[in-house]
Amino acid sequence: MSTPLQGIKVLDFTGVQSGPSCTQMLAWFGADVIKIERPGVGDVTRHQLRDIPDIDALYFTMLNSNKRSIELNTKTAEGKEVMEKLIREADILVENFHPGAIDHMGFTWEHIQEINPRLIFGSIKGFDECSPYVNVKAYENVAQAAGGAASTTGFWDGPPLVSAAALGDSNTGMHLLIGLLAALLHREKTGRGQRVTMSMQDAVLNLCRVKLRDQQRLDKLGYLEEYPQYPNGTFGDAVPRGGNAGGGGQPGWILKCKGWETDPNAYIYFTIQEQNWENTCKAIGKPEWITDPAYSTAHARQPHIFDIFAEIEKYTVTIDKHEAVAYLTQFDIPCAPVLSMKEISLDPSLRQSGSVVEVEQPLRGKYLTVGCPMKFSAFTPDIKAAPLLGEHTAVVLQELGYSDDEIAAMKQNHAI
């Protein structure tokens, strides 16, 4: 089966989550992704949060499927030579080291261009070069804090909160992926590679664009009418936290369902659409609200929006969350059950669609991992297990023209 990136070679100089999530997607699209790891150690996530002693952790296996792994010590002369040969044959190199680290290894962007002018160099950093935080070490929650997500997440009477979703890490990887694919297309026109940089702060901010919208509205109006604080609460000079309220102008909230007393996920998310208000009233047994001036418009409803949600909850609390969604969907009401990760891991529809897949690694055995979220009509990504540390070192070196004796000597010299 032909794949979009068949014949594209990627050097994966990344670790943890932001970089590996990007290069894993490139591998799913058919690229030959070679993960370059420190001899005897490898990516730090191989050892983090292990559930089986001395076996690659799920943290690693779920971010590095379909790749090849080589152990390479780029501090040695032989290791640098191998690296230069890899760069000469590669289409893309991706790194997410601390600022300046890859330069100190001897592989500046200028030197890389000399070796291979067609190479596309993808780089992830916590902050842009012009940021005052450029040298701050960044991880997931650091990026969420600096990108505007934490300050706008949580309840108005509580502290900022970080999201469980990887807005700082995997989201940054997906943003870089888009940039790399654009650079590949640009190379078709120009014949030259380019550097693509992505900061984690920028990636988070890009998902917080509606909050930047709200900041400008707040600056002009002094209030935000779709937030729970309106009209009885107070607004400061920055976008506040809105709890579970919808952020797109449609009021929404988390509502209890049957069993909520013992099941922490017995809830649904319920959205009130202006254009669907009549159906909403019929669904919850309040037809009189359709024409009542206190309820008939979004502006009229906002002062007592929580009373409305409380009334809706009187119904949802009597039935199972799945039954509630099935019933409300008949009235075209946007809603969804709050699904636990246990439910998601067992969901047959996600297995059928390939969004959750089971793969097998030689030492770990079978495990679940996320599949490709995009579905294509012309090909289906074949999700394979993550590589063992250095599993492909000899093969990759042989492809570069090294003999068995040379490979053995490099091993003896701790270059691999």
Swiss-Prot record:
- The reaction(s) this protein catalyses: formyl-CoA + oxalate = oxalyl-CoA + formate
Residue stretches spanning the membrane:
none
Q: Name one GO biological process term.
A: oxalate catabolic process
UniProt pathway: Metabolic intermediate degradation; oxalate degradation; CO(2) and formate from oxalate: step 1/2
EC number assigned by the record: 2.8.3.16
Looking at the keywords, is Transferase present? Answer: yes
The residues listed in the UniProt record as binding substrate, with positions renumbered to this chain, are G248, G249, Q250
InterPro entries (alphabetical): CoA-transferase_III_domain, CoA-Trfase_fam_III, CoA-Trfase_III_dom3_sf, CoA-Trfase_III_dom_1_sf, Formyl_CoA_transfer
Q: Where does the record place the catalytic residues?
A: D169
Broadest EC class assigned to this enzyme? transferase
Cite the GO molecular-function annotations of the record.
formyl-CoA transferase activity
Q: Which Pfam families match?
A: CoA_transf_3 (PF02515)
Q: What does this protein do?
A: Involved in the catabolism of oxalate and in the adapatation to low pH via the induction of the oxalate-dependent acid tolerance response (ATR). Catalyzes the transfer of the CoA moiety from formyl-CoA to oxalate.
Subunit description:
Homodimer.
The family database entries (PANTHER family) matched by this protein are listed as:
SUCCINATE--HYDROXYMETHYLGLUTARATE COA-TRANSFERASE
- Its protein name is Formyl-CoA:oxalate CoA-transferase
What is the organism field in this record? Shigella boydii serotype 18 (strain CDC 3083-94 / BS512)
- From the UniProt record, report the name of the gene that encodes this protein: frc
